[in-house]
Amino acid sequence: MWLKDPDKIYSIINKVQSVLDIPLTVKMRTGWSDPSLAVENALAAEAAGVSALAMHGRTREQMYTGHADLETLHKVAQALTKIPFIANGDIRTVQDAKQRIEEVGADAVMIGRAAMGNPYLFNQINHYFETGEILPDLTFEDKMKIAYEHLKRLIDLKGEHIAVREFRGLAPHYLRGTSGAAKLRGAISQASTLAEIEELIQLKA
């Protein structure tokens, strides 16, 4: 409910900032039910001493419905003059990131759900801003190699049993937009071992 109270935002951040010896960054949404306080909330965070502010372009009530409110994000970007502003929400492509920087006026972008099944997106965006070149999307084979590496690292971290169960929930993101994905997704959802998944995606260590 603090999204309805800029003074509360200032108070909370100021108290946290006062006991830290490291930079404090904050992420918030455009508001609770509407974005009318987005700029005021952002300025309260800036005044309280945050080192950077990230804002997701939806209200708390919207959750992930609708579209990111780029107009409100632009207003916030224009209002903040002392700290970097990081735009978040609906950044799925290099073009989306480019728009947030060039049109919204953000200093940086933050990517969440779009990175699930496509961690390569970070590389594409970094490469574009460093060179001006847009790298091609990954092939299915390359996506499966990354998915396999993801699974192997999960196994190293959590053990095979837990990792495979978690990977069953991640696989649909890697398969999104792939021809015949439903059948493969269904098969992976039944797998219980690394060997079974290796067989399904035809990769070996």
Language-model regions, residue ranges each:
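Active-site mouth loops of central-metabolism enzymes
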Residues: 26-38
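A generic structural signal for short
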Residues: 1, 29-30, 61, 85-86
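Short beta-strands and strand-loop turn motifs
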Residues: 23-28, 54-58
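Short acidic/polar capping segments at secondary-structure boundaries
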Residues: 7-8, 29-32, 58-60
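Alpha/beta catalytic cores of nucleotide-metabolism and tRNA/nucleoside-modifying enzymes
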Residues: 7, 11-14, 19-21, 35-52, ...
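Glycine-rich, proline-tolerant flexible connector loops at the mouths of alpha/beta enzymes
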Residues: 1-3, 55-65
